[in-house]
């Protein structure tokens, strides 16, 4: 489990094709702690397993399914990646619960710079729209963000200066793909409510007594 608070930004240093996926070498340096073989790390929001490591970085493999459902397939040598190690007992949950299981890939529509921060507008895949609500949480490239507004299937997310400083979200351009993971709590709520197969919307929540 992760929090969506990025620890550091790494760089893709090597990519090898495998019979059933790809192997990636990531150059990075965390502020504290050492790697362990088998450790879980979120790479742009994708939970991967450390297979090899040294003081300069680590190596992991991604299956064809993972590549198909995430932006890892588009990574090239030199590209940046957000990195976060899994939560440990006693750690603070500063963002929101992020599993590292990417639900789908969204598309950047616009990055609007403001005097302080920026607004990131993303087209949300139709299959995920019922889970994305105003003031709710959404993980974008592994970063825990709050949805500022929803309009016609698009989500606007406010990027504060600290987020722009600690992530590469400010480098995104129109048309870029981004890994999306919706709030797992929304999935649990849907699974418990009647008529869940039709998804959740504001009208259904009112019918069921919420708000």
Where are the language model's segments positioned?
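Conserved loop->alpha-helix
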Residues: 1-211
């Amino acid at each position: 489990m992760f929090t969506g608070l990025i620890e550091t930004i790494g760089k893709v240093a090597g990519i090898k094709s495998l019979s059933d996926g790809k192997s990636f070498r990531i150059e990075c340096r965390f502020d504290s702690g050492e790697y362990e073989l088998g450790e879980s790390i979120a790479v742009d929001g994708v939970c991967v397993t450390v297979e090899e490591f040294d003081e300069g970085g680590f190596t992991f493999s991604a299956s064809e399914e993972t590549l198909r459902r995430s932006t890892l397939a588009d990574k090239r040598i030199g590209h940046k990646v957000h990195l976060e190690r899994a939560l440990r007992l006693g750690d603070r949950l500063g963002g929101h619960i992020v599993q590292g299981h990417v639900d789908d890939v969204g598309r950047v529509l616009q990055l609007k710079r403001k005097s302080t921060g920026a607004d990131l507008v993303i087209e949300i895949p139709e299959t995920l729209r019922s889970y994305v609500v105003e003031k709710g949480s959404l993980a974008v490239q592994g970063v825990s963000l709050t949805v500022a507004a929803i309009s016609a299937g698009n989500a606007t997310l406010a990027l504060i200066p600290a987020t722009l400083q600690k992530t590469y979200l400010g480098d995104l351009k129109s048309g870029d793909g981004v890994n999306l993971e919706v709030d797992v709590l929304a999935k649990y709520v849907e699974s418990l409510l009647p008529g869940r197969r039709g998804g959740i919307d504001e009208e259904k929540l009112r019918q069921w007594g919420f708000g």
